[in-house]
Design a protein with these regions (language model features):
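Conserved helicase NTPase motor core
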Residues: 6-9, 14-15, 20-24, 34, ...
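Short, conserved catalytic or adaptor-binding loops enriched in Gly and charged residues
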Residues: 86-93, 440-449, 497-499
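Conserved glycine(s) of the Walker
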Residues: 30-31
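Conserved ATP-driven helicase/translocase motor core recognized via long
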Residues: 52, 171-354, 450-451
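Walker A/P-loop NTP-binding motif
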Residues: 34-48, 442
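Acidic, low-complexity intrinsically disordered tails
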Residues: 1-2
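Helicase-core coupling region on the C-terminal RecA-like lobe
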Residues: 164-179, 455-501
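Conserved P-loop NTPase-based nucleic-acid remodeling module centered on helicase motor cores
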Residues: 50-159, 210, 214, 433-437, ...
Length: 501
């Protein structure tokens, strides 16, 4: 039987102990092998049982696959050491091991502790069609009541653009705000914070409001993209004598974008006139195709920049008046969202139903007190597990993160595996910044007991040529702004097709 050879990074991920571990595992780097080997390394070397580990995966299919691979690896090791009684006992315990999605884990917790939370013992999970029907019933009831006796803020929300005759857009907006709030450990407190942030009463500079700060950030991000388009046009002009007359104008345009991007405040932006000038005429251009391409790049870019600058065209006092009106409507929207949340919860409670958000929030309520500290139940649950291993960690949200924290031993017995490049569930409100926060703060060579970061970049699936092309794309597209981190040599994929994974 061929011996499986681990890379240095894989070995570190398997054998490191005594601290929280974040494993940045690129595609094809053998992360499943690492997860299984880490569990079995502790089973063999430390006498652990396989059911002392909590393994969280993203889907039921992934959980079943992981359990199957763990069983297969146990059998492989038993074949090499058939007299090992401890390993023999683990074969039956594989089916007792908690290998599941976070929602299955939460559901099991709620069944065990339903009496603590005063949940009905016969609660069940609503299917999506059922939940959608209850959401629609709840939001319609809330809007009917709002129309009957609206406050000034709610009236402003009811008059939002798109409210329309049938209120479909407003209904969808209320549900969307509600859904976004569910990603936070305390949705009600988060809504209260949002409402405080809307206040522009004593503000004299739009750039100091939450809206202004966001607009300035978005402008800066957008101008970076626009500058890249102009640099492409400039490179074409510099390479071709037939269109070289365009070079000075393009250089001046780039300087203008740099000035706009570095302005940093509302007033500074107002002092920079967005004058892009005109291209000089080129009669009978020797390369009309390149000429047209440069013109199109510049025309499209200038149009985008002008659109980005539109919110900054008003005087500060005019902008603040508009923001104040918007804030009133958004306060009303939050009031409608709170009413919807209460009505939706009541509709589910009457039917003994929970949805996926409920599973997470009731579990968190069980595991933490009002200050966020672990409860007695959390300490009891934490005592079941030697280690918590979370796969696809880049797709975690803040509620799930709080759950893992509550049942860990001060965050030291967690093993977190993911790849921010594969974060594809933002539409389900996953928050890859949780992964990135740890990626930045965990050290590759920490002091004893401190959190550690391990990179797995050796790829066992693809040829070097494919990986080189992928690296080129990631280096161009992944920056601190666009991807949350700079894609450097440490993150680059490396071909390693020698090892067996």
């Amino acid at each position: 039987m061929a011996e499986i050879v681990l890379t240095p990074g894989q070995r570190a991920a398997v054998e490191s102990r005594g601290c929280a571990l974040l494993v940045a595992a690129a595609a094809g780097s053998g992360k499943t092998r690492v997860l299984i080997d880490r569990v079995l390394d502790q089973v063999i070397r430390e006498g652990r049982r396989v059911d002392e580990f909590l393994l969280i995966t993203f889907t039921q299919a992934a959980a079943a696959e992981l359990r199957g691979k763990l069983l297969a690896e146990l059998n492989r090791r038993l074949a090499a050491d058939p007299e090992n009684r401890h390993l023999q006992r683990q074969l039956s315990r594989v089916y007792l091991a908690q290998i599941s999605t976070v929602h299955s884990f939460c559901a099991a917790l709620l069944r065990d502790y339903a009496h603590v939370l005063e949940l009905p013992a016969d609660f069940r999970l609503a299917d999506e069609q059922e939940a959608a029907a209850l959401r629609e019933r709840a939001v319609r009831a809330v809007l009917e009541e709002a129309y009957a006796d609206p406050s000034p803020a709610v009236r402003a929300a009811l008059d939002l653009p798109g409210a329309g005759r049938d209120d479909r857009a407003l209904q969808e907006l209320i549900v969307r705000v509600y859904t976004n709030l569910q990603c936070y450990p305390d949705p009600a407190a988060t809504a209260d914070r949002w409402e405080v942030m809307l206040d522009v009463t004593d503000c004299t500079d739009p750039g100091q409001t939450i809206w202004g700060k966001w607009l300035l950030r978005e402008l800066q991000r957008g101008l970076q993209s626009d500058a890249a388009m102009l640099r492409r046009a400039l490179a074409l002009a510099e390479e071709n004598e037939a269109v070289s007359a365009y070079v000075p104008v393009l250089q001046a345009n780039l300087l203008l974008l740099e000035a706009l991007a570095s302005a940093g405040s509302w007033e500074a932006l107002a002092r920079i006139p967005p004058d892009f000038g005109r291209f000089p005429a080129i009669r009978k251009c020797a390369d009309p195709e390149t000429q047209e391409r440069i013109k199109r790049l510049r025309t499209d870019t200038v149009a985008r920049v002008r659109r980005r600058l539109e919110p900054f065209s008003l005087q500060p006092d005019e902008t603040l008046r508009e923001l104040s009106g918007s804030a009133e409507a958004l306060r009303g929207l939050l009031a409608l969202t709170r009413a919807f949340s209460a009505r939706f919860a009541a509709e589910k409670s009457r039917r003994h139903l929970l949805d996926y958000n409920d599973l997470e929030h009731f579990a968190l309520r069980l595991l933490t007190d009002r200050s966020g500290a672990p409860t007695a139940a959390a300490r009891e649950v934490a005592g079941r597990y030697a280690e918590i291993l979370v796969d696809e960690y880049q797709d975690t949200n803040r509620v799930q993160e709080a759950i893992y924290s509550a049942i860990s031993r001060e965050g030291r017995n967690v093993f977190l595996v993911g790849d921010v490049k594969q974060s594809i569930y933002r539409f389900r409100l996953a928050d890859p910044t949780i992964f990135l926060e740890k990626y930045r703060t965990f050290a590759e060579e920490p002091a004893e007991g401190e959190p550690r970061r391990i990179l797995l970049s050796d790829n066992f699936r693809s040829h070097a040529e494919i990986l080189s092309a992928a690296n080129d794309v990631f280096r161009l597209t992944m920056t601190e702004r666009t991807g949350g981190l700079v894609y450097g040599d440490a993150e680059a994929l490396r071909a390693d097709r020698k090892s067996v994974v």
